[in-house]
Amino acid sequence: MFRFPVSLGGSRDEDRHDQITPLDDHRVVVDEVDFFSEKRDRVSRENINDDDDEGNKVLIKMEGSRVEENDRSRDVNIGLNLLTANTGSDESTVDDGLSMDMEDKRAKIENAQLQEELKKMKIENQRLRDMLSQATTNFNALQMQLVAVMRQQEQRNSSQDHLLAQESKAEGRKRQELQIMVPRQFMDLGPSSGAAEHGAEVSSEERTTVRSGSPPSLLESSNPRENGKRLLGREESSEESESNAWGNPNKVPKHNPSSSNSNGNRNGNVIDQSAAEATMRKARVSVRARSEAAMISDGCQWRKYGQKMAKGNPCPRAYYRCTMAGGCPVRKQVQRCAEDRSILITTYEGNHNHPLPPAATAMASTTTAAASMLLSGSMSSQDGLMNPTNLLARAILPCSSSMATISASAPFPTITLDLTNSPNGNNPNMTTNNPLMQFAQRPGFNPAVLPQVVGQAMYNNQQQSKFSGLQLPAQPLQIAATSSVAESVSAASAAIASDPNFAAALAAAITSIMNGSSHQNNNTNNNNVATSNNDSRQ
């Protein structure tokens, strides 16, 4: 920046006015800034020189090239750095010292600006470093959390696997204990094959339960449709195996003795005997009764798990399983008779492994005793099914040839209890020679007692039988009855044990029950009469 010292008037102007000579009259004094003082001085000097040459008596006022300090104090600083005095040369009027100062100041200013920018960049760099450090810290924390979660998940999975393994082992031990402690079911051959047969009869869903370690009830409730399909498939496969086995005689060496004797050695006979016994692993009890309902009421709780159409019968066959306890092996099939739609055929298979309610003991005891005695009579020889001298034939067939029949047309022995036949008047011998029918026609006979008596009679007679290679459950079925019925059953048991003929024993048992009931009714009537007489006397 350039500074021009300017004087706007003052004592110097007055002094100059006092010193004005006549030669300076042509100069005009103005109160303005004269920016051309140098030129004016040059012209004035030339004029003075000319005057000197002419008269040599001209007064010349010499102006100094520098402005006095006291005059400079009155100058106005306009910031232009201009000089009003002559520097004595033709050089630039810009002061070299001032220009150098300006350059230094400019450099300092730029340096200060650069320093400020550097400071800002340092601050920004520090902020970025802090952000990077925070991000690194967060990443490390998340990584540690992820590792901890993965370890917890692995520990949880390992603990679950360990628990599942323990549960499966416990389930296996329980099954082994059940194989040892629980009595064999009535469809097995003998006590020696209890463990092997139990292992062979384990269904697919039970094997799945052992692998997974889950209880059977959870698996059944989780997917009942799949369980029903599997069970239905098992029933169908068993029926197909029955039809295929009995359709081709070569598959059953029991009914082909020539093939077993053709070898003429002892090993072949042993193999044929084992095959024949394997054929008799299960027994089924079929009950025919007239009912309009979908199934007869036997006191148990059932769940339907399948249905299919059978050959030769337009009515579908329904499959049920007992749901009163988890893992109960009892199954039943319900189907209408093709010839008479009013007859409902119910086929039971298996034995309950849980306590039964009073309403279910009658049918369960009857079917269990019938199947057990059927197997006990069939194990004596290969012709045991067809031999009328076996225990069951001697027990039931003399009573009524139409009440119970034994089927040998299937690999599994089946006994059919026909409850639809009524006494026929055209055949008087059936009623005369049948003690069971005689007592069934007596007045006051209660049909609900018959299954209990038959079941208990079969049970006691089977205990006394020498043909039986079986053992019924150690815990007998619980028959919930009144005290009078219990006394009647005990009397029937004593009569059956003392009489070798089952028909006569059964007749004696029913007689004792009827007499006990009538005696109890007479006692009740006598007590009522005595009470009424006492009341009237009072």
From Swiss-Prot:
Please give the Gene Ontology molecular function terms for this protein.
DNA-binding transcription factor activity; sequence-specific DNA binding
Q: Which InterPro entries match?
A: WRKY_dom, WRKY_dom_sf, WRKY_plant
**Which Pfam families does its entry note?**
WRKY
Keyword Isomerase annotated: no
An example of a Gene Ontology cellular component annotation for this protein is: nucleus
What UniProt keywords apply to this chain's record, in alphabetical order? DNA-binding, Nucleus, Transcription, Transcription regulation
| Amino acid composition bias (Basic and acidic residues), ranges on this chain | 168-177, 198-209, 226-236
Its recorded name reads Probable WRKY transcription factor 31
User: Source species, please?
Assistant: Arabidopsis thaliana
Q: Kindly list the organism's lineage.
A: Eukaryota, Viridiplantae, Streptophyta, Embryophyta, Tracheophyta
